[in-house]
């Protein structure tokens, strides 16, 4: 049985232990120590990483009563070794996990919803709640969670007897066999949990609910705590200041300024589209009435403009109109249409002679092709 030092002291960063066993595995070596401060994956939290005698530990898993450390190199059995966990990573995870307990406890107490899902990685922490919350209710929960941090109450760990457990009102997502570890944040939450937590709630720092979405009849919340919340604030502050500078707007007026720019952009896009269509009309006007076949090459056409130009030309009585956008270096996008004949044979020829791609219906085909303008024009002569 591996002694779990991460339960004895969640802030223990370095420890010594005896190597019980070390065997080769798929991606290195699998070692069991007499005791460990490395937390194995569990309870929605990833495993600790670090080093043992300078050898990298990339994963930790618990199997039965033993904890297996997965290393990039071999350890000598029977030797006393020194382990060091990646503390910044562990502390960040404890900040998130303890913060999640506070948020879940507050939601359960105020709205009666359960935490039905939890995931914690090195970027985000998400929790799934069994019922919906409005924007105002989320802000209420966030404010209450930070008030809890300010109170800086100690986190209490206990292992109640089965008799005591029956009388205890605690949160738990699953039925637990054997000894149950209870994490209590006085006044805010009582929950069964296997993960290490901070000593005092004040260590969590800022709790910020950054995103929410409807999920399986409830809500999924993305939250950041401590250093992660600080980093997020700093990044957003930089973005806000950049927008303020670009729009020459005060901080409290940037949303209004962005909306104004958005409206102006929409108007300009509309005016540009109208102008571009007028250019297409002028371009089509230059085509003689009733010309049987028209082949147009224009590198400036974009989006749906080739098709629009084709339709304008066909309205002039042209039997077949082919429009190519692009250039010889990067290739051409094309559209070919007719109101009087099947244009699919043209697409077939382009495929065969110019390694083209495309297809469509008898009245219109479109695709891409590589070749010279001169050679492609001969197809329509």
What does each model-found stretch correspond to?
Residues 1-381:
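A glycine- and charged-residue-rich anion-binding loop/surface
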